[in-house]
Amino acid sequence: MSRVGKAPIALPKGAEVNVAAGVLSVKGPLGTLSQPIHSLVKVNVAEGTLTFEPADESREANALQGTMRALAANMVKGVTTGFERKLQLVGVGYRAQLQGAALKLQLGFSHDVIHEMPEGVKAETPTQTEIIIKGADKQKVGQVAAEVRAYRPPEPYKGKGVRYADERVILKETKKK
């Protein structure tokens, strides 16, 4: 059994936590995030730490305690330092550039792919073949990165496509006569 839920979350300077009407909200320099609290979990805020307790002794309450603690830890990290995901474009003529708040991708299609960024998520293009997606909400950052990668996932023979910077693409051997 994991004991993630029992570990307290230290609140860094600049992070404020508020628990009201069954909603946990965390405010920091990068914005505000909120998460509904499950009825099987109790939240305690004291002396710069955030702790979670199960409301009863059921297995579901113990599981939700760990889940709520992990979500809250991601919220605290998100509003203080933020999250980022790096993508690489591999292929001849594959390019990315910002067009206002949207991301314009040239991925070998007959048309350019324009991906609108949701609220709270920003994209940067340090080079034409690199994309950095940043934001306070870990789930949104990962979702946007997955959506951009899905336009042209890495193909298994040459490795062309959009990939995460830390992703290793295993190449297949071509058919021999």
Curated annotation (Swiss-Prot):
Provide the protein name.
Large ribosomal subunit protein uL6
The answer to keyword Ribosomal protein applying to this record is yes
In Pfam terms, one family for this protein is Ribosomal_L6
User: Its GO CC terms?
Assistant: cytosolic large ribosomal subunit
HAMAP family in the cross-refs: Ribosomal_uL6_B
Write down the InterPro entries for this protein, in alphabetical order. Ribosomal_uL6-like, Ribosomal_uL6-like_a/b-dom_sf, Ribosomal_uL6_a/b-dom, Ribosomal_uL6_bac-type, Ribosomal_uL6_CS
Say yes or no: keyword rRNA-binding present: yes
- Which branch of life, at top level? Bacteria
What the protein does comes down to: This protein binds to the 23S rRNA, and is important in its secondary structure. It is located near the subunit interface in the base of the L7/L12 stalk, and near the tRNA binding site of the peptidyltransferase center.
- NCBIfam families listed in its UniProt record: L6_bact
Quote the subunit structure annotation: Part of the 50S ribosomal subunit.
Organism equals Cupriavidus metallidurans (strain ATCC 43123 / DSM 2839 / NBRC 102507 / CH34)
The biological processes this protein is annotated with in GO are: cytoplasmic translation
* Stated family: Belongs to the universal ribosomal protein uL6 family.
Classification lineage: Bacteria, Pseudomonadati, Pseudomonadota, Betaproteobacteria, Burkholderiales
What keywords are assigned to this protein?
Ribonucleoprotein, Ribosomal protein, RNA-binding, rRNA-binding
GO MF terms on file?
rRNA binding; structural constituent of ribosome
